[in-house]
Amino acid sequence: MITFENIQQLEKYTLMTMHGLFNQLKLGIISIDNAEHLLFTPYMMETLSSLGVKPDIIDLIHKRTELEDFAAFNLSIDDTVTVCLQRSEELLKQYKSVEFNDKILINWRVIQK
């Protein structure tokens, strides 16, 4: 479970996670499907929106859905990923003062198949 003290921490964490995923996509380390399983789903968009996460962040998650369209037509995703990386960096700069003062990741659980 991940616990946040306020919405700003959640927004910063989401942006940091997105930035990392976009960077890994750009480097070819993970697949589009893998990134989707981690964060980029309609469920995550709805959940984050219901918690009051800023629309700019929700829009960036939605933008990732375009990558599937590119992949379906065997087109390069590099330009879109670069734009998403830049946008996530711009948004992250707004959260410089947001700190994580306590451990946020607690109650680890691994489910083995």
Predicted regions and their residues:
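Acidic, Ser/Pro/Thr-rich low-complexity regulatory regions
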Residues: M1-K113
